[in-house]
Swiss-Prot record:
ATP binds at residues 90-98, 122. It catalyses: L-seryl-[protein] + ATP = O-phospho-L-seryl-[protein] + ADP + H(+); L-threonyl-[protein] + ATP = O-phospho-L-threonyl-[protein] + ADP + H(+). One of its GO terms (molecular function) is protein serine kinase activity. The modification Phosphoserine is found at residue 219. It is a lipid-anchor. Pfam families: PK_Tyr_Ser-Thr. This is Probable serine/threonine-protein kinase PBL18.
Length: 387
């Protein structure tokens, strides 16, 4: 797993769950109804749940009838991480630290460094920002929802005040680091479309399972060795509306710059809130800019506000494209991706597409990117696209 940083802060402060962005938190009006959240209880060192919705996820994923998680002891995880040594740490944040460790592939018992399976061990501070409820929520969802584009939760440890989670290790780290870290190798167009498609596939699966992710952002998108994206950090996930309800009203918690404007204003949460966040990340993939950039001035500090005028005119799309691409991308594909982002960022939630529709369009884009030969790579120059 890549950088694994988390905290909760008010608007204006920088924060990150697996990287760096600002967390927003606001309680709903007292008259608002809070949706119920089923969280796991404990029995004989394993997890049980009192109820779970009847879900019909896609065939690509799997809904387990009960979690299949390993209950680690604290001493086992101390051994696996070499006593949580500083040189084993791969991430740090307000929640605590993440360490690289090794366990047996079948036994899941601690093994020597370099042998067995590499894992990421997330160790929470007792006074950290990620509370017990968020910790349980993550176990609840990742313990039951299995999909190629969700980070796999292998197990947990709960001993007294000690709370740890054990995940599969993601060798390429977070998308945020690849896009924004100084000195990072530029991501080619084909890889960016692969990341967008695989992240959309994970989010689409969640929505089909009636789960609202609520924290879709570049730092929560982790990458495997082949740059397949997997969604991580499910502490803010929420069960979607059921029956004739159109939304869930809840405390406003999310990340500044990624959270949908109507959710921030009203606390009304729908799957279209996630769609907006996806549009922001897609815009980050296209532009190579973070959603909030304090190094910029004026409208350029907010990626969405700056980019929207260029997204609506295909002749100006090149103006928002990441210069690190060196112009090596298909103009038609860039315009198509920009159009997807524009639709996702619609201020009217009902006019945003479903993630299933986004996924279908991105699949076509990713397929065309795979087939793209060098003759289709064009260098975009301002003179050739002036209106």
């Amino acid at each position: 797993m890549g950088n694994c940083l988390d905290s909760s802060a008010r608007v204006g402060n920088r924060e990150s769950t697996f990287g760096g962005s600002s967390r927003i938190s606001r309680k709903p009006n007292q008259s608002s109804r809070l949706s119920s959240l089923t969280i796991p209880s404990y029995s004989n060192n394993s997890f049980t749940t009192s109820s779970w919705s009847n879900l019909t996820p896609r065939s690509e994923g799997e809904l387990l009838p009960s979690p299949t998680l390993k209950a680690f002891t604290f001493n086992e995880l101390k051994t696996a991480t070499r006593n949580f040594k500083p040189n084993s740490m791969i991430g740090e944040g307000g929640f605590g630290c993440v360490y690289k460790g090794w366990i047996g592939e079948r036994s899941l018992s601690p093994s020597k460094p370099g042998s067995g399976m590499v894992v990421a061990v997330k160790k929470l501070k007792s006074e950290g920002f990620q509370g017990h409820k968020e910790w349980l929520t993550e176990v609840h969802y990742l313990g039951r929802l299995h999909h190629m584009n969700l980070v796999k939760l292998i197990g947990y440890c709960l001993e007294g005040e000690k709370r740890l989670l054990v995940y599969e290790y993601m060798p390429k780290g977070s998308l945020e680091n690849h896009l924004f870290r100084r000195g990072a190798e530029p991501i080619p167009w084909k890889t960016r479309m692969k990341v967008a498609f695989s992240a959309a596939r994970g989010l689409s699966f969640l929505h089909e399972a009636k789960v609202i992710y609520r924290d879709f952002k570049a730092s929560n998108i982790l990458l495997d060795v082949d740059f397949n994206a997997k969604l991580s950090d499910f502490g803010l996930a929420k069960a979607g509306p059921t029956g004739d309800r159109t939304h869930v009203t809840t405390q406003v918690i999310g990340t500044q710059g990624y959270a949908a404007p109507e959710y921030i204003a009203t606390g009304r949460l729908t799957s279209k809130s996630d769609v907006y966040s996806f549009g922001v990340v897609l815009l980050e993939l296209l532009s190579g800019r973070p959603t909030l950039d304090k190094s910029k001035v004026g409208v350029e500090r907010n990626l969405v506000d700056w980019a929207i005028p260029y997204l609506v005119d295909r002749r100006k799309v090149f103006r928002i494209m990441d210069t690190k691409l060196g112009g090596q991308y298909p103009h038609k594909g860039a315009c198509a991706a920009a159009n997807i982002a524009l639709r996702c960022l619609n201020t009217e939630p009902k006019l945003r597409p479903d993630m299933a529709d986004v996924l279908s369009t991105l699949q076509q884009l990713e397929t065309s990117s795979k087939k793209m030969g060098s003759t289709q790579n064009i260098v975009m120059s301002p003179s050739s696209h002036m209106s």
